[in-house]
Amino acid sequence: MQLLPHVDIFTDGSSRGNPGPGGYGCILRYLDPTGLLHERELSAGYRLTTNNRMELMGVIAGLEALRKPCHVSVISDSQYVVKAFNEEWVSAWIKRGWKTASKEPVKNADLWQRLLQAMKPHKVDFRWVRGHMGHEENERCDALATAAADGLELLEDTGFVPE
């Protein structure tokens, strides 16, 4: 049995205003069997979105960039994303038909569902890191996310619904 390649995906999301212009940053890191380190950075900015949507988009973009099944460690400063999986919020939402415990529709259900699709070919675990505390990759992802949010060519977040 062949072991899955291991990829670390570091992510961060940002929004100016919440809602406001936003962006995500993502670093994919893979050490190949010869010991060569491969790294790729991804980012994009959106006209009107929220920080939580951008946190989700960072993970989605990283997973969707992978070309074959991998063991993936997602490293994020977003408790929203990490706790949703590690504390099984997502499983509960699915059982309740994408409703919260208080029977409200789950926010960002479109992106949660897209994230679940992106996870399917992979074995994924989620790890939380404290943001803005000198974690090199988290700081880089934050810089990518804020630069994307401040960029000139912002995309439309078609799933964003103002409250």
Regions found by a protein language model. Give the residues of each.
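RNase H-like nuclease fold core
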Residues: M1-R53, M57, A61-C70, F85, ...
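RNase H catalytic domain
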Residues: S14-P21, M57-R140, L144, A149
